[in-house]
A protein has these predicted regions:
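Polytopic transmembrane helical bundles with strong interfacial aromatic enrichment
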Residues: 1-144
Length: 144
């Protein structure tokens, strides 16, 4: 183990919250104007209120951010390895970039050009979440 169990527990809590973010984000996309073939029209889309789903999605994102911040504080206060702390800091920065893109999307009425950016950043956030979890255990011997 490379950092305390409490930080690993919060990493798992953050991962669960991230799953909720991803599911609700998919639902927001599925209910919106850019969710599929333009010829299908809104009848072929998820028949839920996009605005309400966006609010649920944002609440899940805030829970994820809070869990990630708690994890980061635990890592910093426990003397965890520097690579784990750096990953946590980068992850928080990436979550905030993703948040900003989402707010821009919401306030601008989901312009088409924002969707690839939001999806790409989602991939970055998921990857760094995995990196942070992986820093919790040393799987290979250190060479230095």
């Amino acid at each position: 183990r490379r950092y305390p169990g409490s930080a690993q527990t919060w990493t798992l809590i953050a991962a669960a919250a991230l799953c909720l973010v991803l599911v609700t984000g998919t639902m927001v996309t599925g209910s919106g104007p850019h969710s599929g073939d333009a010829g299908v029209g809104m009848e072929g889309r998820l028949q839920m209120d996009t605005r309400v789903l966006a609010y649920v999605h944002s609440v899940c994102m805030y829970l994820y951010l809070i869990a990630t911040i708690i994890t980061t504080v635990l890592l910093r206060n426990s003397g965890a390895p520097d690579d784990a702390k750096r990953t946590a800091y980068v992850l928080i920065a990436m979550i905030l970039v993703q948040w900003a893109i989402g707010v821009i999307q919401f306030r601008m009425g989901v312009p088409r050009w924002t969707i690839p950016a939001h999806i790409a950043m989602s991939s970055v956030v998921v990857a760094f979440s995995g990196f942070l979890f992986a820093h919790g255990k040393r799987r290979l011997p250190t060479l230095v």
